[in-house]
Regions:
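Acidic/histidine-rich catalytic neighborhood of metal-dependent amide-processing enzymes
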Residues: 1-65, 94-102
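Active-site-adjacent substrate-binding region
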Residues: 57-152
Length: 152
């Protein structure tokens, strides 16, 4: 999406690490946004998950935090319009969304956020890799583009 110029110019893409170690990358991003006095409308955390694999879902929405009811309605509308099978897990395993939703200080309150995950099969933390359904890639990319570019 980035290489093809399919993301709005207002979209900030940050590659973070250390999710398994207290989400240090997400904390660093929050601190940087605070220093730069950036107003952020939403954060989308991209990840893999075992949720939805057995249901053959193309993607899952997990750990949604801080969206108002109208924005939530618009997100559901986008999901329904996609016509793609997805799984919704309001409170899944902790991830970076928990950091983004807390904010970094009184200067930078929590950011509405969710995790957009690709369902996989296998040990996500092992050395053997995981299985990903090829049929999930295009719908995942499509909903990511729509969510990232959406103005709610």
């Amino acid at each position: 999406l980035m290489l093809r110029g399919e993301l709005d110019e207002s979209v900030l893409v940050a590659f973070t690490g250390d999710e398994e170690k207290d989400s240090a990358g997400a904390i660093e991003i929050m601190q940087m946004l605070g220093r730069m006095e950036c107003l952020v409308g939403k954060a989308l955390v991209l990840d893999v998950t075992n949720e939805g694999w057995e249901d053959e879902a193309a993607f899952s929405i997990e750990n949604d935090h801080g969206f108002d009811i109208i924005t939530g309605y618009h997100i559901v509308e986008l999901l329904q319009a996609s016509g793609t099978s997805c799984v919704f897990v309001h409170e899944a395993e902790p991830d970076e969304t928990w950091e983004y939703s807390k904010g970094s200080s009184s200067d930078l309150p929590g950011i509405p956020c969710l995790s957009l995950c690709l369902p996989v099969c296998g040990n996500m933390h092992g050395d053997d890799g995981v299985l990903l359904r090829k049929s999930s890639v295009i719908p995942y990319e499509d909903i990511l583009r729509k969510l990232a570019n959406a103005v709610f």
